[in-house]
Amino acid sequence: MGVMWGLISVAIASLAQLSLGFSMMRLPSIAHPLAFIAGLGAFTTATLALFAGLAGYLIPVSCWQKTLHSLALSKTYALLSLSYVLVRVVTRSVRRFLSKSDARRIVHCGGDNADFPARQLMMACASTAAIRRRNNIEH
C-alpha cells in the first residue's frame, strides 16, 4: 500500500513540476515584479498552471506521510528520485515530438501575435538549436 501512495505522490509531484515550468515560461519575468504581479492578476492559462503546480506540491505531502508509515526510508528515497527521472523523460519526449512536427504550421497558427505560446516555444527552440550549432562549431 505504501508503494501505491508513493507512486501517486511521484505522479502528482511530476505533474506539478511540469506545470510550474509551463507557467514560468509564459508569465512575465520575476525580475520585473510589477509585470509579474500583473500577469498573475490576468488569470490566464499560465496563472492557473502556476497555482495548480503550487497545489500539486502540497498534495503529495500527505501521500508521503502515508508512504513513510509503511515503507523503509531507503525505498521511499528511491521512489522520490523516480519523480526527477519522470520529469526529465517527459520533457525530452515533448521536445522531440515538437521537433518532429511541422513547425511552420504550429507557428502559423499564432499569426503575427508574438504572445502566442507555440510561437514563443518555437522561437526558443530555434535559438537553442542555433546556440548548440555554434557551440559544436567552436569546439
Swiss-Prot record:
Keyword Protein biosynthesis recorded: no
BP GO annotations: lipid A biosynthetic process; lipopolysaccharide biosynthetic process
One of the record's GO cellular component terms: plasma membrane
Pathway: Bacterial outer membrane biogenesis; lipopolysaccharide biosynthesis
Annotated TM spans: 2-22, 34-54, 68-90
Domain of life according to the entry: Bacteria
Predominant cellular place of this UniProt entry's protein: membrane
Keywords of this entry: Cell inner membrane, Cell membrane, Lipid A biosynthesis, Lipid biosynthesis, Lipid metabolism, Lipopolysaccharide biosynthesis, Membrane, Transmembrane, Transmembrane helix, Transport
Protein name, entry field: Putative 4-amino-4-deoxy-L-arabinose-phosphoundecaprenol flippase subunit ArnF
Originating organism: Salmonella arizonae (strain ATCC BAA-731 / CDC346-86 / RSK2980)
Species classification: Bacteria, Pseudomonadati, Pseudomonadota, Gammaproteobacteria, Enterobacterales
